Regions:
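Conserved short alpha-helical segments that host acidic/polar catalytic motifs at enzyme active sites
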Residues: 1-166
Length: 166
């Protein structure tokens, strides 16, 4: 259940949190500088067809809590991209935030410029990033969520027809 996942995610940190819900045909994003279980109480996630959350310690980037949103995409990322400057030097997107997670979006934008489908986007991003990544990339205009990881810390389950991941 969502409350249990949120409670377990506090182990990752309580410095900041963010929740994405999908309601009335649009995504709603709420961020806070406190733990995710408190934020969950402030959201109307129960009536959403999609609810995703993130909890973290501040490690790389003191602001710009997740999810990171730009160019009609968003990402929730657990890990650290250690070659972020190398990535920024190789893409045409301009950096907007002070978080390494934005590099995942910049790479997704580059990939989608040249490709008609998104089949290999997760592998492309993982091939360009050095560090640890478990992420969900959302492409709302295509109605797609892409899960990918290079460290095995992405867990997926199904309960009563609902997809859960952590």
């Amino acid at each position: 259940d969502v409350k249990i996942l949120a409670s377990h995610s506090k182990q990752r940190g309580i410095d900041s949190s963010g929740i994405v819900t999908f309601q009335d045909a649009k995504y709603q994003i709420v961020r806070a500088d406190f733990e995710v279980t408190k934020l969950l109480q402030k959201c109307k996630w129960q009536s959403s067809s999609i609810a995703m959350g993130h909890s973290r310690l501040v490690t790389n980037g003191m602001s710009d809590n997740q999810p990171v949103v730009r160019d009609d995409l968003f990402v929730i990322h657990n890990g650290i991209v250690v070659n972020e400057q190398e990535i920024w030097d190789s893409v045409s997107s301009e950096r907007l935030f002070e978080t390494d997670s934005e590099t995942i979006l910049a790479l997704a934008i580059e990939y989608m410029k040249d490709k008609q489908d998104i089949e290999g986007i997760g592998q492309y991003i993982l091939s360009k990033c050095k560090g640890t990544i478990s992420a969900v990339l959302a492409i709302p205009k295509l109605g797609k969520l892409i899960l990918f990881s290079n460290n095995g810390s992405l867990y997926v389950g199904n309960k009563n027809g609902a997809l859960y991941f952590a």
